Amino acid sequence: MFRCWGPHWGWVPCAPTPWLLLSLLVCSAPFGLQGEETRQVSMEVISGWPNPQNLLHIRAVGSNSTLHYVWSSLGPPAVVLVATNTTQSVLSVNWSLLLSPDPAGALMVLPKSSIQFSSALVFTRLLEFDSTNASEGAQPPGKPYPPYSLAKFSWNNITNSLDLANLSADFQGRPVDDPTGAFANGSLTFKVQAFSRSGRPAQPPRLLHTADVCQLEVALVGASPRGNHSLFGLEVATLGQGPDCPSVNERNSIDDEYAPAVFQLNQLLWGSSPSGFMQWRPVAFSEEERARESALPCQASTLHSTLASSLPHSPIVQAFFGSQNNFCAFNLTFGAPTGPGYWDQYYLCWSMLLGMGFPPVDIFSPLVLGIMAVALGAPGLMFLGGGLFLLLRHRRYSEYQSIN
């Protein structure tokens, strides 16, 4: 209803009706009145034993709650997210147990009774497809090459990339075993950033964030593809909600000021709000400048249940949740067989938000509100003016008295 499929890669504007504009304006108005919460956010690398380990803890303290995000590249890159109803909750790490074959119980948020929500997200594999003979929108988008297991990557020491001023840190990795030299000049980077207040990043897709979220930016740079038209993707796994998987939905908007020609926002929700959520726009970029010309479509497969034994093992997920868990997985693929692609500059970047509480809701920008006011106001003024004209004309004729 809000988008049309363009000739090259994505969505182009469709003309909405005035009634649609009015309904969207009315529906979005309450969200524009919601308050913004500021949190005291700290970011630290938890010291490992006996050697430094990549365990990043983000603690966001609000007026009566605390959010914990624990990111790690022990095994595949993963994050454990925990929301508590106290400002005093703390993270406890048992390093000797965490680095053991059975790390269950090594990671805790105390007091346990304060935990209101917890889940995890694991980035298990880097996917690559040969899209030479693939059709638009096909799933999978071509013949798959053997995937790269992210549990078999070597990751940098994140202490060297820790930026406390911007509340960010980079996990940068390469395969431990790279017989073809595909990553000789390349790397895969997971950039994590936290926020103490609401706002938008300077670069597209400029997702609206609050103090309740972290942003993850995934960048594949300089790696040699195994084909002339390779498409890349990520396999993502999360904990199921009992026997069921989290829900995935799409939200549409007529406002594309912050992400030109992209009118859709995808959401993964763990249960009903307020709980946890993952948000992203279905767009990636093949150039560092992230102009519209370098935009790539991002497609998500259906979320499905999967066996834990089929996924790379995540020590921090087992450390917090134990070994008996139901997992759900889905794939994200970036690009299409035609148009711009990773092959242009050997660059791919995609962003998402991960948070707890109520997902951020976009309100209409001043520019779009002005356009809507004109679109809705002009017909109304014409109708009002026409009515006044007819009324005055009727009164003029009714006051006329014949001289006879």
Swiss-Prot record:
Residues 36-370 are lumenal. It is found in: Lysosome membrane. Residues 1-35 form the signal peptide. Changing Y400A: Abolishes lysosomal localization and results in mislocalization to the cell surface. Localizes to lysosomes when expressed with wild-type MFSD1. One of its GO terms (biological process) is protein localization to lysosome. Residues 392-404 are cytoplasmic. One of its GO terms (cellular component) is lysosome. Glycans are attached at N64, N85, N94, N133, N157, N166, N185, N228, N331. Interacts (via lumenal domain) with lysosomal protein MFSD1; the interaction starts while both proteins are still in the endoplasmic reticulum and is required for stabilization of MFSD1 in lysosomes but has no direct effect on its targeting to lysosomes or transporter activity. Required to protect lysosomal transporter MFSD1 from lysosomal proteolysis and for MFSD1 lysosomal localization. This is Glycosylated lysosomal membrane protein. It comes from Mus musculus (Mouse).
